[in-house]
Swiss-Prot record:
GO CC list: cytosol
Enzyme Commission (EC) number: 2.7.2.3
Residues where ATP binds: K202, E324, G350, G351, D352, T353
Gene: pgk
Main location (coarse class): cytoplasm
GO molecular function: ADP binding; ATP binding; phosphoglycerate kinase activity
Residues where substrate binds: D25, L26, N27, R41, H64, L65, G66, R67, R118, R151
One protein family per Pfam: PGK
Protein's UniProt name: Phosphoglycerate kinase
Organism in which the protein naturally occurs: Leptothrix cholodnii (strain ATCC 51168 / LMG 8142 / SP-6) (Leptothrix discophora (strain SP-6))
Amino acid sequence: MKILRLQDLIAAGQVAGQRVFIRADLNVPQDDAGHITEDTRIRASIPCIEMALKAGAAVMVTSHLGRPTEGEFKPEDSLAPVAARMGELMGREIPVIANWTDGVEVAPGQLVMLENCRLNKGEKKNNEALAQKMAALCDIFVHDAFGTAHRAEASTYGIAQFAKIACAGPLLAAEIDAISLALANPKRPLVAIVAGSKVSTKLTILKALSANVDGLIVGGGIANTFLLAAGLSIGKSLAEPDLVGEARAVIDAMKARGAAVPIPVDVVCAKTFSPTAEATVKAATDVADDDLILDIGPQTAAILAAQLKAAGTIVWNGPVGVFEFDAFAHGTETLARAIAESDAFSIAGGGDTLAAIAKYGIEKDVGYISTGGGAFLEVLEGKTLPAFEILTKRAAG
């Protein structure tokens, strides 16, 4: 994927004295009092901003925050707490500018934060007049918000159409590189883990991956539907019986390519869904009518761990059991540690996956951790994200 990168423009001396508009993802969680409870996204966006400032640019940064009503400002929708936190981290005052679409005064070496872009009428519908106004504010537009790369909005897509120069910031560029490594040109064997409660929410991903991967590991409620497709009983476990045909089609598609969806040989069951429930390991053929399957068994975990250690590339989306309950966390932990020990290039994404990575402290052993959420899932579905599409188009002239 050929895109223009901010670091390339800086290296070519094209950024000094220019007005740079950065679309970041600063959509951080806040408590009821408006205090930021988790600042990873703010920290992740600072390298791009500092890069532009060091190069001598006049820098404007904006983001969405929450779900405000367009055209109606409410104090809780303001980026002021974000600017304050970013200012603490960067050791500088960051003024917040409201009603900014008609013009912003910013000098080289200066940084301002443009108020919540979703307050602008026409933002979400990618209104052309709004996008042109935004583009007129800058000489260079920098997209550095992978979390919004799957949305075609005025501040993510429209501005990139009309700005003099449109490029990717370091965060977005890293996502593009990791995705290309994992999916476009993977080192084989390519093994994917797709887990979650429902086949219905991940069906497009399962179908897309079944045409490309060498091994497709399913987990969570999704695996229960695949157990049904393999003719096994799952007791009262969470599953979608109406999607058994779809699961079978995925198994058949993999088989036709000489690949496989490994079906668990043993599972961990309980009688109730509770952190204190008694865990019992059973053969997958011995599940009782009143059993709930809450994890893969140790034998299955060992087989899958060996497959992951032998992989060339690993794509991981979702924990394979109820890892929040320690009695049902063994499967997820075993696979997480196998990914950490594997020589494969690994890319992981999705909220629960990130929580599992944090729980087992393997952040440094995963090749790339995607913070994209919905954008990451759309990439796995084989879709071309609007942000990638417009930046590629602009790079091609």
